[in-house]
Amino acid sequence: MSDLRDPAPYDALLLLSFGGPEGPDDVVPFLANVTRGRGIPEERLKEVGQHYFLFGGVSPINEQNRALLGALRKDFADHGLDLPVYWGNRNWAPYLTDVLREMTTDGHRRIAVLATSAYASYSGCRQYRENLAESLAALEAEGLEVPRVDKLRHYFNHPGFVAPMVDGVLASLADLPEDVRAGAHLAFTTHSIPTSAADASGPVEAHGEGGAYVAEHLDVARLIVDAVRAETGIEYPWRLVYQSRSGAPHIPWLEPDICDHLETLGAEGVPAVVMAPIGFVSDHMEVLYDLDTEATAKAAEIGLPVRRSATVGDDPRFAAAVRDLLLERAATERGRAVERCALGSLGPSHDLCPVGCCPARAPKPAAAGADSPYV
């Protein structure tokens, strides 16, 4: 095997995701896991769970992750990469601690981790690292030999992540009626987070209004707009907007909300909109409910034609990007200088989260960072 195709020192890859219910009886326990420590009563969890009950109590994220797991295994096998791929979740089965225990008993000692979150933020990165540290501490308490885990860098601007989204936007534009297509507006959506969390996202030097979270999304949106212009010859107007807000109404979150944005566009006479969920790797419940159900209903109410572009999901180009990220990090860990693939103005993200990156309100141990107790 070529040195640059060698996964060493890694002996396994962990696909780490959020998790979701697989049936109606799972919904409230799942939401209790998501909100643990906040003292939210069960009746309120049942209210929040209505989004899931509309879809039979099943989150689409699990099937999406199974498909991505299969795509990764196929890509690795097709390219002669003999590396097992496991899947674990933060909030539902297969639980992270159980999967790390399985990996440890299977003999794996150096594990690369791919989180299904492409951008910098507390909830999209450090919280995953905190959960990894909690699970490693649990294994240590059981007397098991604790493996080293390394989280692969943020991939928001990797060509294998961006290209499928470009194709999705182009397909959605082509699906619009011809008489409104050229005048369409592109609404790039991502999960809203508190403005304080956005401002503190990424390394300390990126902190400020919007932080790395907003800057990274804007960079991806510009990449897509440029690629669409190159393909169509049209400079489509666009904006980064937000969705899926939760929490107390008095706490500022990133705005505008997608539904408010659609109302504004309708009032301005915009003839059509493509909603592009660039903040989501796959069709989460936030995509199926907040965009396909709620935002689409709002657009119909005001007579605005909309299309929702596809997420990356298990696109073979994304699976290849994961392989590239893995081999890049492996070579770096072996002391090799390698090309780090990235598009846009921000360049490739860091391998090791520095101290102060995406800080938590209450400091907790986090794995796979410069401040990690597990190295």
UniProtKB/Swiss-Prot annotation:
One of its GO terms (biological process) is heme biosynthetic process. It comes from the Bacteria. Its EC number is 4.99.1.9. Pathway: Porphyrin-containing compound metabolism; protoheme biosynthesis. It is found in: Cytoplasm. GO terms for molecular function: ferrochelatase activity; metal ion binding. Keywords: Cytoplasm, Heme biosynthesis, Iron, Lyase, Metal-binding, Porphyrin biosynthesis. Belongs to the ferrochelatase family. This is Coproporphyrin III ferrochelatase. It comes from Streptomyces griseus subsp. griseus (strain JCM 4626 / CBS 651.72 / NBRC 13350 / KCC S-0626 / ISP 5235).
